[in-house]
Every structure is written in C-alpha cells, then in structure tokens.
C-alpha cells in the first residue's frame, strides 16, 4: 500500500477537555488528500478516511432524498423509509475490503450533484441558521471548483469525492488507532447539511453499515438503530409499514426506547422514589427554576468540550466526534457529532443527542443551541422533568430562554417509561417557568387508550405556586342528599391572602354556597369560612355553618388563638358537611385565648362559649361559659437549697344563659417540694395549700354569696428502678423493674354548698392513680388518705431503643374511706347530666367502697409494624371488669393498615345495666363496642378499604364502610360506600344514611374529588394524607 500525497492539515483524537481557546491546527501525524483526512488502519492493509468540513453542521441534518435505492441492497431488504440517499456508483479504494474481526468498512458513496439541496429536504434548517448555511455552501462551492484532481478514482473539485485509489506509503508507518476511534469509519459530506454513514463494530453506536458489491461498482448499505442523519426510524420486517414517529402525536415504541437510554444517562431514576411502595403524591416541580445565583454562575461559567476525535477549521468551527460533549455550568450537550462555532457561540449536535440542565433532561435526534442566549431547538425530542417526575415527547422543542419554552406536537404524562396509562396530548404547549403556568392548544386526554376529554385551550400550573382557577370538582351520592356535585373556584388575590368560592348542588336539598378566605400575615394565620343553604327543600329552612379562626405568634413568648363557630342545627354536621372539624353534635364551642410563656412559668387569658344546637337539651344543662379566665403558673428552684417552689393561680367569671347559679372563682395553690433523685431511685416529698374563694349570684336560698375553702395537701412520691441485660434469641434486651409508692393526704372539707362550674371526673387510667385530686377543676377537692402501689416493667431493645413490652399494674388502698362527692347542689353538672343524691361517689371505679379497682396496662411492639395494647379495671368486689379496652394495629408507614379494637365500660349508677339492650339515644355512659378498620393490599396495585363499628350493647351496626382502591405511581382511583347512624327520630328509633364516595387522581396533573382522603383520615386510625409524611 502506498501513502497519499502531502498533508493539507492535521487531525488528531481529542480525549481531554478542549476549551474555546483551541489551537488553529494540531501537529499530530496525519495525511490528507484533497477533501479527505486519511490514516492507515492497524493491520496496515487499508486507509481510514474522514471528509474535511468547514461548517459546524446544522440544526437539522438532511433527510433522505428521493426513493432511488442503491444499486444493490444485499440480503436484508430495507423498507423504503430506511434506504440511503441516492448514490453515484464509484470504485472503492483499492485494498478496501472489510478487515476481519474489526468491523471496519470502507467509506460509502456520496450523493451526486443531483441530490436535493439541504434547504429543500425534510426537517430543513430554522430561519436563524439559513444565512449561516448559505454562506457555508457558497464557500464550499467556490473551493470545490478551484480544487485540482488529486487522485485516480477521485472527483476533482467534488466536495464528496472518494478517497484516492492508491497513494504513496508514508515514510513513517502510522497507527490508525491514534487518529480514528476503533471500529468506526465516518464520511461526512462537506455541505451545510451533512449526511453521515458509518460501519459499526459490535457495541458501537448505531448507524449505517456499507459493503462494496462484488463488482466494486456500488455499495450495499444497512442501517443499525437510528439514522445518524437525524430522521431515524426503527428497521421493521420486510413488507411491514414503518412507524411514522416523526409525525406521531403520541408516545411511540421508539420514544420508549429513547426514554430507556435517557434514564441510563441520568444520575438516578427520578421515578424510583415516586413509584416506591407508599409514595402517594408527586412532589412539587419547583427545583428546575433557576435562581439568580444559578443564572449568574451559568453566564460566567466556561464552555468545556470533550470528545474522542476533534478538528478545528479557521479557528472558528470546532468539530468533535465519538462521545462528544459540551458543558457549561448545569448545561450538558452530548452527541455522536458536535460542532462548536466560537464566533456565533452556537452548538450543533446530532446522533443520540442528550441535553440536560437543572431539573430537565432531553434526548433528541438533533440539537441547535445558542448557549449565551439560552436558546435552542431540539427535533424529535423526549424530555424528563426530574422533580415531578414527569416525561413527554415533542416533535420540535423550542427553548426560547431560561424560563420560557414551547413544544410542537407534544404528549405529556407522569407515568414512568414503559407505562402510558394516561397521556395528555396537544398540538402546541407553552411553558413559562417565571409565572409557573403552562397552556396547551387542542389538548385531549387519553386514559388506558380511550380519549376521555378534549378542550381547544387549557391553562395549567407547572409548579406548586398558587394560581386562580377552577379546582378539582367533587361529587358523590347519599340517601339524605341525593346526588351532589361541588365545583370550587380559587382566587389568588394576593401573595398573602386568597379566597375559594364553592357552588354545590344536591338533588334532594337544593343548592349550597360556600366560601373560604385565608390571610397570612407576618404574625397571624387567619381563616374565615361559611356555608349556607338558602332553603333546604326537605326542612324548608335556611341552614348553614360559619367559622372564624386566627392563630398568631407575636413573639417567641406570646401566642394567641381565636376560634369562633356557629352551626344552624345538630343534624347539619352529619347530613351536609363538617367543614369546621367539630367533634360534638350537641354543643359547639367557641373560644379565644392568649398565652404568654417565660423561663419559669406561663400565663393564659381565656374566654369561651358553648352553643346548644340540640333542642332536646334544656338551657339549664348547657355548660358554663368562662368570660374571662386568667390562669398562671410559676416553677423555680430555690437557690442551692434543693427545694423547689411551684404556684398555680386562677380567677374565672362563670356565666350561664339560664337561671343557674353564676359567679366568680379565685383559686390559689402554692407548693414546696424537695426532690431527691439518683439513676436508680427518686423521692419527692411535697406540701401544698389550696385556697378557693367564690362570689356567687342566683345561689340557693340560705347560701351565702361568698364562700371560701382552704386545705393543705401532703404527698410523697417514691420509686426504684432495677434493670438487667439479657439475650433472647438474636435480640439484645434490657428489662427494668420499677416499683412505685405514692402517698397522699388531704383533709375532709364539707363542700355541699359549693357549686360545680367546670369540675368532672378524670378519665380513670393507670396514670391517674398518682394524682393529688381525683377531680378535674377546682370546684371539688377530694378528701384523700391513701396509698397507691404501682409496678412497671419494660423490655427495651438495646440496639434500637424501642420498648418492646411495657406492663404496669396499680391499685389504690384507702386508709380512710373517701366521702367527698361530685354532687351538684344546683341540679346539673357541666356535662348536662343530672346527678341524683346517691350519685357522685364514683371513686376509682367504685361507689362507697374501701378499695379501688385494680388497673392494668400492657403495650407491646411485636415488630416495627405491629402494635398491641390494652388496659383494664377489675373490681375486687364483683370480680367483674368494669372497664377495659384492647387494640391491635398493623401500620407499615405506607398506608397499609389494620386496626382491631374492643371497648367496654360499665354504666354509672341508676343507668341501664350493660346486659340490657338499651335504646339508642338513651342517656347512658355504657359502652360495649367493636371496631375494625383496614386498608390492605391484594393483587397488584389494588387495596381493599373497610370499617365496621358494631355495638354489642344495642346489637346493631353503628357504621359500615367498604371500598376498593387501585393505585399506581401515576394515577389512583377510589370508590367507597358508607352507611352510618345519623341520629334518632322522635320515637327514639335510629335513622341511617348511606353515601358513596368516588375519587380519581392523575398524579401530578389533576384530581376529581377530594373527599375520600379527608374522610379516611378521620375514619381509619393511622391513615395519612397523600402529602403528609409518615
């Protein structure tokens, strides 16, 4: 083999970063012939040549020309859309047979002068590039006209002339691997829209493979993967029509292949977290917004270029091939071929193009970028929004600036690659990151391959910023309301306040109108909401509810709350809505208070009021309101003496709407204690003095308007802590044994003339055994001369710190029988329950007994997800459990839940026995209920949801709920049916209501109906809202 003539310019591989200050020429050994750069192959049997170029390529490489096939196609028949551009038969270079084992092939033919010009080919250049390409073409034409014929078999002056048939051997043997990436020979026409044909070794990038025919007069070419010219098509079977992906208005199979490759080039799969088990809702896509710091850093960042092969023309256009990449701050452009114009600051890329910036990633056939202006055009592009995550395709994507872009023939979804359960299609989509809005023209929704919605225009958010517009409608069906549809509209009035108006139509009741106003200030969060039915078609009355809520944090020490509520009637909350989140259907509380805290204590100023919404309850049994109430506490160590001083004080004005006794109460309780503590024991003796004074009105005859009560309170609290470490199987545990003794003495004081404004029994549990007063509030001070014995044992996992098992047992022993009762001399207690003369002696579960019930409590965490707990009170006199509860919960913190519980409570005296079937609505404190609730998975992506509350006391179901939910990482559908007790009629017979809830959510786009999540949050213990952390 003889070498070519003298070199015209040099070329060399580029394997390190190349900056904009690229040298005019590289002095690496190479040879050139006319319009070709040539180097010897490694086996020294052929030449490997690359055509010279002066331009940097174009946004859109040329499409195939007319459907004239090459002279021969070889064994595999190519579809018309996969054929190479028209060729002129030429003789291949001498000795250019394929080299066994290397995959190297000689250059293919170059189109003749009859080939279409770039400007007339499909996917031609954009207007911004036409001038540049025109100038490049004219200079090439002039150069080719003046060029002499340099070798036999070549075309003198022809830009795409073939390499020389034979050439003199260079004086020094050259290793081709130093100049051309192994396994690749590329030939590029020297026109503005280059065509690229290449042969590939196994594992090499896709492209054309060309072989000379036996007569060596023409070429047989075969396409592997996407066409490097930028109009790639998957190669189909013979006779199968090709997929017209370039005009497709959906996500095609070829797009899915591109998405797979795009994911492989990203640092991580953005759907990994969203599609993980338990992830309920996509995160807000706001991390793709450039901050001012990002913009400045991008402008100042240098441009870095990497590639396996590079070449510079006239110190202006740098060309790179072989895994080429351009980087500037967060922007990365990667492709098989890159050209960088240093004067125009433009980048052209083609062949497996990959572009990535903050929060966004693109794959495309071609990319034209103006780096300084943050502009670009990508054709046949696939994109991924990493922070949603979401993805889509656009046949043409225009990046107009760093905040604005628009897309032609676009498809969008939040489903991961390979899943197209739902897709949003549009002729054109515009995204404005600055405003957080997008719009689409001629948009239509497709779900499971079925079109379900069309609109000529739609406006949508692209991040979590608040925007005015319609919110997701809600709908449902119930027995008492009929079918109801609610349509809310949101007004983003200002950055610190907004308004939501709602229109709701119920076929059985008529229209309902509501509003919700929110205002956020520097120190306060204010909310005003209300609903009204102008005329309920069933009750023929105006019904509604209203609420005002204001929370303020004025300083680190001062906090305020105002919570005002109004409801028209007691049935409104069950029948229509409980927007206020109220827990009582009898009394509606409104309150306001201000808290001031400091290092040694706190002060609270409070006022409250109770609205009676149940007409069956007389006014006399309505709770007292406090207007105002001032309460404070103080706690401080007295120097180094070891003593601690505590004080509690309260002054309250109690009012009432009826003729009940009213008045003011002042209560002061100072206390001194001397705590002694060590790691294994504690001893806390203390003494307190409680002074209570009343100023009364409407008092009973013969009772003074001023009452005063003073009593000392002595107590000693002591305990020991023993522990031991041991192994149980593979678990390392620590067991503690904690005995506790608590003694209390309070002398007996006659309090029969004292009113009961706010006192009541504590909920009797294990921890109430260690209080110095068995009554809540200051109206009653219990006489106490008793000892409480308690024992607690814990099993602690030493590796995790979890309490695997905690068991406690306690009992009160009376030294002197208690006698102070909760009898109200004025006929009613704050809960509206009239107490008879033999009631009120409710002492730790017993009446006029010398011994209280034995209380036991057990909590165990079987695993991280399983929890079992229970508590019971056993009467030593009757041998009956007078009170008890047990519950088993499974919660894997992924909203897979199951709750099993049972509650039992004996009635108060003079109430029906627990064994008797009481009538619903009768005043009784007895309970005998079971409660089962769950949300458990079955099959793939399916959950069954349910709840069943059953009263063994009334022998009937209190509430039943059943539903199904299908959830994937991009959509969720839920349907629920519910039946529940709605109250009682005039004859005390129970009434029920049934309702159906339906919710459809396309994650990251929209939701139809939002009542299901809010209802399940209240109905199933442990359930979390989609946007709530576990």
UniProtKB/Swiss-Prot annotation:
GO cellular component: cell outer membrane; transporter complex
Ranges of biased composition (kind: Pro residues): 161-171
Example GO BP: Gram-negative-bacterium-type cell outer membrane assembly
InterPro entries: LipoPS_assembly_LptD, LptD, LptD_2, LptD_C
Biased composition (Acidic residues): 126-137
Record's keyword terms, sorted: Cell outer membrane, Membrane, Signal
Subcellular compartments: Cell outer membrane
Domain of life: Bacteria
Chain segments carrying region Disordered: 50-213
Compositionally skewed regions (Polar residues) per UniProt: 78-91
Signal sequence range: 1-32
A Pfam family hit: LptD
Family assignment from sequence similarity: Belongs to the LptD family.
Quaternary structure annotation from Swiss-Prot or TrEMBL: Component of the lipopolysaccharide transport and assembly complex. Interacts with LptE and LptA.
Job of this protein: Together with LptE, is involved in the assembly of lipopolysaccharide (LPS) at the surface of the outer membrane.
Name this protein carries in UniProt: LPS-assembly protein LptD
Record organism: Methylococcus capsulatus (strain ATCC 33009 / NCIMB 11132 / Bath)
Originating gene: lptD
């Amino acid at each position: 083999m003889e070498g070519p003539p003298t070199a015209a310019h040099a070329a060399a591989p580029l394997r390190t970063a190349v900056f904009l200050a690229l040298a005019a020429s590289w002095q690496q050994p190479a040879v050139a012939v006319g319009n070709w750069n040539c180097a010897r192959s490694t086996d020294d049997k052929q030449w490997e040549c690359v055509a010279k170029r002066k331009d940097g390529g174009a946004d859109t490489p040329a499409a195939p020309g007319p459907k004239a096939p090459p002279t021969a196609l070889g064994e595999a028949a190519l579809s018309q859309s996969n054929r190479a551009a028209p060729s002129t038969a030429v003789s291949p270079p001498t000795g250019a047979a394929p080299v066994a084992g290397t995959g190297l092939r000689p250059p293919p033919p170059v189109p003749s002068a009859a080939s279409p010009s770039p400007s007339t080919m499909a996917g031609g250049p954009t207007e911004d590039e036409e001038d540049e390409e025109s100038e490049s073409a004219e200079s090439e034409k002039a150069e080719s006209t003046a060029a002499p014929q340099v070798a036999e078999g070549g075309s003198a002056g022809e830009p795409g002339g073939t390499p020389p048939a034979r050439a003199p051997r260079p004086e020094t043997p050259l290793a081709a691997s130093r100049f051309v990436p192994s396994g690749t020979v590329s030939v590029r026409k020297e026109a503005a829209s280059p065509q690229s044909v290449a042969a590939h070794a196994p594992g090499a990038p896709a492209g054309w493979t060309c072989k000379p025919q036996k007569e060596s007069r023409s070429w047989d070419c075969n396409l592997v993967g996407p066409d490097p010219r930028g109009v790639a098509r998957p190669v189909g079977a013979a006779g199968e029509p090709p997929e017209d992906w370039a005009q497709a208005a959906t996500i095609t199979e070829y797009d899915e292949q591109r998405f797979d490759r795009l994911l492989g080039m990203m640092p991580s799969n953005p759907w990994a977290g969203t599609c993980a088990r338990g992830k309920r809702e996509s995160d807000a896509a706001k991390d793709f917004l450039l901050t001012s710091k990002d913009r400045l850093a991008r402008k100042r960042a240098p441009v870095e270029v990497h590639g396996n092969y590079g070449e510079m023309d006239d110190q202006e256009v740098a060309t790179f091939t072989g895994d080429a990449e351009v980087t500037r701050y967060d922007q990365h452009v990667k492709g098989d071929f890159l050209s960088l114009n240093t004067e125009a600051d433009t980048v052209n890329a083609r062949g497996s193009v990959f572009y990535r910036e903050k929060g966004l990633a693109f794959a495309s056939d071609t990319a034209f970028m103006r780096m300084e202006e943050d502009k670009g055009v990508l054709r046949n592009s696939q994109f991924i929004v990493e922070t949603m995550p979401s993805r889509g395709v656009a046949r043409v994507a225009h990046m107009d600036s760093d905040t604005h872009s628009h897309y032609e023939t676009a498809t969008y979804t939040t489903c991961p690659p390979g899943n197209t359960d739902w897709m949003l299609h549009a002729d054109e989509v515009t995204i404005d990151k600055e405003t957080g809005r997008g719009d689409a023209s001629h948009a239509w929704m497709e779900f499971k391959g079925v079109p379900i919605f069309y609109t000529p225009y739609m406006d949508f958010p692209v991040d979590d910023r608040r925007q005015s517009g319609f919110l997701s409608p809600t709908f449902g069906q119930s027995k008492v309301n009929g079918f109801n549809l609610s349509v809310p509209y949101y007004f983003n009035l200002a950055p610190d306040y907004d308004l939501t108006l709602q229109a709701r139509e119920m076929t059985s009741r008529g229209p309902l109108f509501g509003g919700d106003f929110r205002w956020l200030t520097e120190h306060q969060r204010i909310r005003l909401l209300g609903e009204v039915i102008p005329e309920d078609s069933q009750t023929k009355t105006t019904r509604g509810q209203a609420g005002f809520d204001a929370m303020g944090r004025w300083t680190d020490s001062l906090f305020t709350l105002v919570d005002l509520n109004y409801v028209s009637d007691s049935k409104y909350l069950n029948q229509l809505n409980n927007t206020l989140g109220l827990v009582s259907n009898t009394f509606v509380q409104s309150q306001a208070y201000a808290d001031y805290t400091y290092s040694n204590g706190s002060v609270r100023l409070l006022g409250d009021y109770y609205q009676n919404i149940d007409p069956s309850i007389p006014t006399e049994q309505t709770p007292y309101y406090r207007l105002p109430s001032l309460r404070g506490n103080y706690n401080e160590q007295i120097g180094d003496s070891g003593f601690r001083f505590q004080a509690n004080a309260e002054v309250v004005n109690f009012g009432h709407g009826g003729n009940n006794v009213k008045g003011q109460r002042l209560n002061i309780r100072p206390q001194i204690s001397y705590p002694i503590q060590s790691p294994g024991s504690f001893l806390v003796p203390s003494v307190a003095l409680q002074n209570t004074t009343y100023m009364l009105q409407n008092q009973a005859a013969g009772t003074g308007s001023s009452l005063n009560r003073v009593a000392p309170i002595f107590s000693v609290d002591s305990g020991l802590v023993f522990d031991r470490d041991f192994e149980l199987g593979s678990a390392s545990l620590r067991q503690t044994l904690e005995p506790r003794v608590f003694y209390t003495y309070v002398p007996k004081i006659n309090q029969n003339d004292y009113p009961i404004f706010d006192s009541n029994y504590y909920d009797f549990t294990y921890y109430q055994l260690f209080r110095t007063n068995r009554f809540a509030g200051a109206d009653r001070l219990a006489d106490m001369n008793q000892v409480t014995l308690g024992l607690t044992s814990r099993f602690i996992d030493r590796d995790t710190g979890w309490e695997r098992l905690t068991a406690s047992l306690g009992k009160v022993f009376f030294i002197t029988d208690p006698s102070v009762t909760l009898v109200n001399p004025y006929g009613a207690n704050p809960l509206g329950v009239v107490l008879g003369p033999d009631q009120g002696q409710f002492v730790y579960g017993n009446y006029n007994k010398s011994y209280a019930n034995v209380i036991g409590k057990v909590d165990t965490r079987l695993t991280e997800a399983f929890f079992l707990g229970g508590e019971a009170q056993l009467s030593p006199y009757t041998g009956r459990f007078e009170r008890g509860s047990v519950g088993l919960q499974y919660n894997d913190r992924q909203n897979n839940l199951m709750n099993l519980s049972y509650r039992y409570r004996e009635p108060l005296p003079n109430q029906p026995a627990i064994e008797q079937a009481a009538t619903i609505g009768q005043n009784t404190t007895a309970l005998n209920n079971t409660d089962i609730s769950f949300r458990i998975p079955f099959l793939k992506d399916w959950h069954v949801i349910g709840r069943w509350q059953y009263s063994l006391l009334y022998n009937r179901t209190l509430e039943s709920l059943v539903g199904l939910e299908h959830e994937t990482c991009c959509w969720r559908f839920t349907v629920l049916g519910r039946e529940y007790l709605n109250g009682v009629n005039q004859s005390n017979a129970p009434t029920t209501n049934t309702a159906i809830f339906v919710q459809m959510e396309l994650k990251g786009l929209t939701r139809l109906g939002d009542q299901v999540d809010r209802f399940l949050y209240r109905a199933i213990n442990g359930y979390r809202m989609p946007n709530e952390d576990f």
